[in-house]
């Protein structure tokens, strides 16, 4: 089975969010599952810094049906720690911005890349069984396949899988881009890619992909409701028979407390005491009182409403008054950046506000914290809770999306479960969940030890996820005419 994974960002070549981690790790595990994957992404400016042994394999390729004279080149290297080839679509006009999701025209850029992918596969004679596209930026690929490439023998047996990593980002643009895309005008209607007088790239992907998945089973159900559907719930219900949820995994080689070079002290379940050495070392680094007994709550997040910061803001003072240390890392809305900075000024012994992105500090927080807070309004999958479980740091979450699929409320009688949480999006419920976790930490040591044991034994591997994706590829291939 030959699969092309197509994405705007792929770790370690270009990373903005969790999508890069997913598409960076999945090929390695698909390879182990006897799939023959390749990866295709744009050659962003940052790729030059992060890619080794980049070879130009073809140049000056044109796209006949696009309203542009721009041509593209193709570069190639290998995804690290694999035998998987990765191809880069290079065009100075569209992909020379400093950051991944920037450019002169984001709609044109996505259209150009989608069309260039299909031409790349043809000129290199890379015939694929499945094109696995990700998010709105690549959602027009299935649309092109079912329209302009419908009679193309090269793609006669090629099927598509669309993965929606976050329904909140849809690629909604002015209808003028229909002309640039070269797509037939009949697509511009309510049953096509038209969306409230504009065009919606993700809607096109949902309607024209053979199979669709989101990054957790719960989120796949949630987005078919009005509350979470972002005005696409009707379209998603229309495709519900072809809509699945597959939890992301995490790379166990990359995120391993026994070998992670980014943390202070390596540890495992066999010497869990060393976890507390990480706490004391982090306390020292951040200027907090050095005491392994003080419960430390970590939070690594974008500082935006979606992550539950509106309800956290209502009870942050109460949480800090529980005599804990609260370590936050992230950037985002100015009001939340200021909130945490002020909290640190007011409670310097209890709050460490790190308003930045620092991957090494992130790992130290995962390893050093006792608890990890994720009170998200919605969370398609969430990786933070997975990393925290892997490092024996107990998650406190709102049960939504992937958080509901990975964190199981601890049952004191059965000694099952790996965390704590709440359902109703309400600050008092958040406070109650934090209080429950702190009670177990301070007063129920046997249960806390069991919680850490359960957390670190939770299967969050990519092996599990890769097997699920192979099932979806087979479902898509069964739709071949």
Swiss-Prot record:
Pathway: Glycan biosynthesis; glycogen biosynthesis. GO terms for biological process: glycogen biosynthetic process. It catalyses: [(1->4)-alpha-D-glucosyl](n) + ADP-alpha-D-glucose = [(1->4)-alpha-D-glucosyl](n+1) + ADP + H(+). Its EC number is 2.4.1.21. Signal peptide: none annotated. ADP-alpha-D-glucose binds at residue 15. It holds the Pfam family Glyco_transf_5. Synthesizes alpha-1,4-glucan chains using ADP-glucose. PANTHER family: ALPHA AMYLASE DOMAIN-CONTAINING PROTEIN (PTHR45825:SF11), GRANULE-BOUND STARCH SYNTHASE 1, CHLOROPLASTIC/AMYLOPLASTIC (PTHR45825). Belongs to the glycosyltransferase 1 family. Bacterial/plant glycogen synthase subfamily. This is Glycogen synthase. The gene is glgA.
């Amino acid at each position: 089975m030959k699969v092309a994974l197509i994405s705007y960002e792929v770790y370690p070549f270009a990373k903005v969010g969790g999508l890069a981690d997913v598409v960076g790790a999945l090929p390695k595990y698909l390879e182990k599952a006897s799939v023959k994957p390749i990866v295709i992404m744009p050659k962003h400016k940052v790729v030059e810094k992060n890619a080794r042994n980049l070879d130009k394999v073809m140049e000056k390729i044109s796209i006949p049906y696009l309203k542009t004279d721009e041509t593209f080149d193709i570069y190639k290297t290998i995804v690290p720690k694999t035998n998987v080839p990765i191809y880069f679509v290079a065009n100075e006009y569209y992909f020379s911005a400093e950051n991944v999701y920037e450019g002169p025209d984001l709609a044109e850029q996505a259209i150009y890349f989608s069309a260039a992918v299909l031409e790349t596969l043809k000129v290199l004679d890379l015939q694929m069984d499945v094109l696995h596209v990700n998010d709105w930026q690549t959602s027009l690929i299935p649309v092109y396949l079912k329209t302009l490439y419908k009679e193309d023998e090269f793609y006669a047996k090629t099927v598509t899988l669309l993965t929606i990593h976050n329904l909140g980002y849809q690629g909604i643009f002015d209808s003028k881009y229909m002309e640039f895309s070269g797509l037939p005008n009949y697509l511009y209607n309510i049953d096509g890619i038209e969306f409230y007088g504009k065009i919606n790239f993700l809607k096109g992907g949902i309607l024209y992909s053979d199979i669709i998945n989101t990054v957790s089973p719960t989120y796949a159900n949630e987005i078919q409701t009005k509350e979470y559907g972002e005005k696409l719930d009707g379209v998603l219900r229309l495709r519900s028979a072809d809509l699945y949820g597959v939890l992301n995994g995490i790379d166990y080689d990359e995120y391993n407390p026994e070998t992670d070079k980014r943390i202070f002290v390596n540890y495992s379940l066999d010497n869990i005491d060393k976890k507390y050495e990480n706490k004391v070392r982090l306390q020292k680094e951040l200027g907090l009182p050095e005491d392994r007994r003080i419960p430390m709550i970590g939070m690594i997040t974008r500082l935006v409403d979606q992550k539950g910061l509106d309800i956290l803001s209502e009870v942050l003072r109460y949480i800090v008054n529980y005599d804990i240390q609260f370590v936050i890392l992230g950037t985002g809305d100015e009001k939340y950046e200021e909130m945490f900075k002020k909290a640190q000024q007011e409670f310097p012994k209890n709050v460490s506000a790190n308003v930045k992105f620092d991957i090494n500090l992130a790992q130290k927080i995962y390893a050093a914290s006792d608890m990890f807070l994720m009170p998200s309004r919605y969370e398609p999958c969430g990786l933070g809770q997975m990393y925290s479980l892997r490092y024996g740091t107990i998650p406190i979450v709102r049960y939504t999306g992937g958080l509901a699929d990975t964190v199981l409320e601890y049952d004191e009688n059965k000694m099952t479960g790996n965390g704590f949480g709440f359902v109703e999006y309400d600050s008092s419920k958040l406070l109650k969940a934090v209080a429950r976790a702190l009670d177990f930490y301070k007063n129920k040591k046997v249960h806390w030890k069991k919680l850490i044991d359960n957390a670190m034994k939770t299967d969050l591997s990519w092996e599990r996820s890769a097997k699920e994706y192979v099932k979806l590829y087979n479902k898509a291939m069964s739709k071949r005419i």
